[in-house]
Amino acid sequence: MFPERLDAPQAYDIAKAMMDGFNRHYRLFRAESARAKHRFETADWHGQQRAQRERIEFYDLRVRECVRRLDKEFNAGALPMDVWHQIKLHYIGLMVNHLQPELAETFFNSVTTKILHRTHFHNDFIFVRPAVSTEYIESDDPGARPTYRAYYPSRDNLHETVVRIVEHCALQRDFENLPRDAGHVVQALQQRLGAVKLRTNFQVQVLSSLFFRNKGAYLVGKVINGYNELPFALPILHGEDGRLLIDAVLFGENDLQMLFSFARAYFMVDMEIPSAYVQFLRSLMPRKPRAELYTALGLAKQGKTLFYRDFLHHLRYSTDKFRIAPGIKGMVMLVFDLPSFPYVFKLIKDQFPAPKDTTREQVQGKYLLVKQHDRVGRMADTLEYSLVAFPRERFSDELIEEIRRHAPSQIEISDRDGDGRQEVIIAHLYIERRMIPLNIHLQECFDTGLDKPEARSALEHAVTEYGNAIKDMVAANIFPGDMLWKNFGITRNGKVVFYDYDEIEYLTDCNFRRVPPPRCEEDEVSGEVWWPVGPHDVFPETFGPFLLGNDSVREAFMRHHADLLDVEFWQSHKERIQAGHLYDVFPYDSARRFRCASPSSFQTQGDST
């Protein structure tokens, strides 16, 4: 119950201190995001990567700062609960007319849950449900930039309109030939529109801020004609001579889904009203959850908040039980899922059998490495949670026993909230998008019969994509470590993505070697490794026996990716990275690129990133 009167004098001051903490966080977050434009203009690629990594840490730093301030100035942990009721009410008042209220709610939750006992983690004390609407938020500042701009071209001046749209981005670097690039865009658009009649509402809406990631800047918008909307994005890159060019045009929901994939690094976007950007992006990608859009924009904590709300909603309206995930069980991670929910839940086992030589802390470090690194569309993002409570009745007994056997330190079953309901509390877990494990996908091809063209084509595509995934990770200085098929998954769009991170390494930390010649006949026929192997030694020519036991798989692999078995491939990329050269891995097929220019890039065969 909320109090009828706000009579605690310190309640407003605490609420104001928390809001000050959030405002400081978002001011710094937005400033760092806005600087991405200058880094792009000056081709500061290493600075861009460094900023993308460092910005991930901003949120937790600001939360800790705020907690320290509340403890020091207000002894917040000792306050009675009726004061915390009032603090939340004052905070709601401070969110009225705020431009980022949903982010401010999440910040309040993060601070409060570090101070209060878990029994108070419900809607009386934190924002389990949103308290302030994010619809139709607008800035009243006369100098504020609108969320998006609308343009009203005709067929006759479409070219001039495209030029004007790009010029409004105000990039402080010359284009190679903007009229030429605009011509390519118009030609592609006219091919999509065909002979369709342009209706009276024909317009182009474009988000005001560019989306920056690595070496690319992306202009995102949609074409509206009658009742139809066509999402699009224009990738802007540096050409070989340093001037800018439009590299391609992406059309439709699927292209935009690839651009905003959960397997890519987060964008840097200067947003005053992030909810308005998310609302616009959802009109382009209606199947993409808002949680994933906030995460793609670098607002990962908001993504976690929305994901958890979606998860609780799904639990309320489903009845199936959590189970051990199908597939080959891992030696490091215990994986379970809810069949009706498109995600998997992964927790680290307490002990690892040989030959695994790692620790819980090292595994967590690997997952953090992936979180902070450029995932190039080939490594699944993860949501990390602690002390997550699930209804006991939704867990199968088999799953409970599996967790108790392999990760007893990670599970507690109790009525911690005191409401009479037993809960399964998992101490620490990761959540990832569910994909079909690649080994299962290949087995389905075998079961269908490779004499059938569709099965053979699916196998060829999967094996080709597997090699492409490895090569894209190589381009980003990542060696996957355990390259078995079961550690890769295939998405609904047919992309192959890596998701097992416990053996991942920087490519530059690996020592790529050839297998030495046998010393004697016994060495030659031995099935064992007889030569000395260091902790970071990798022997690419030994990959074949582990990966290519099936003749059809081997044929497809050797046709497209035989170089992965050659030490020279790996060593050359290691040396290239050590020399400071960053390859480009873009989120669209190389066939989509305008052929008038080709900036230096790393394109895998059949690239579909």
From Swiss-Prot:
Record GO terms (molecular function): [isocitrate dehydrogenase (NADP+)] kinase activity; AMP binding; ATP binding; phosphoprotein phosphatase activity; protein serine/threonine kinase activity
Catalytic activity entry: L-seryl-[isocitrate dehydrogenase] + ATP = O-phospho-L-seryl-[isocitrate dehydrogenase] + ADP + H(+)
GO biological process: glucose metabolic process; glyoxylate cycle; tricarboxylic acid cycle
Keywords: ATP-binding, Cytoplasm, Glyoxylate bypass, Hydrolase, Kinase, Nucleotide-binding, Protein phosphatase, Serine/threonine-protein kinase, Transferase, Tricarboxylic acid cycle
This enzyme's EC code(s): 2.7.11.5, 3.1.3.-
Family: Belongs to the AceK family.
Tree of life domain: Bacteria
Protein name: Isocitrate dehydrogenase kinase/phosphatase
Binding site for ATP: A325, P326, G327, I328, K329, G330, M331, K346
Gene Ontology cellular-component annotations: cytoplasm
Active-site residues, as the UniProt record annotates them: D381
Chief place of localization: cytoplasm
Keyword Metal-binding applies: no
Function: Bifunctional enzyme which can phosphorylate or dephosphorylate isocitrate dehydrogenase (IDH) on a specific serine residue. This is a regulatory mechanism which enables bacteria to bypass the Krebs cycle via the glyoxylate shunt in response to the source of carbon. When bacteria are grown on glucose, IDH is fully active and unphosphorylated, but when grown on acetate or ethanol, the activity of IDH declines drastically concomitant with its phosphorylation.
Subcellular location(s) of the protein: Cytoplasm
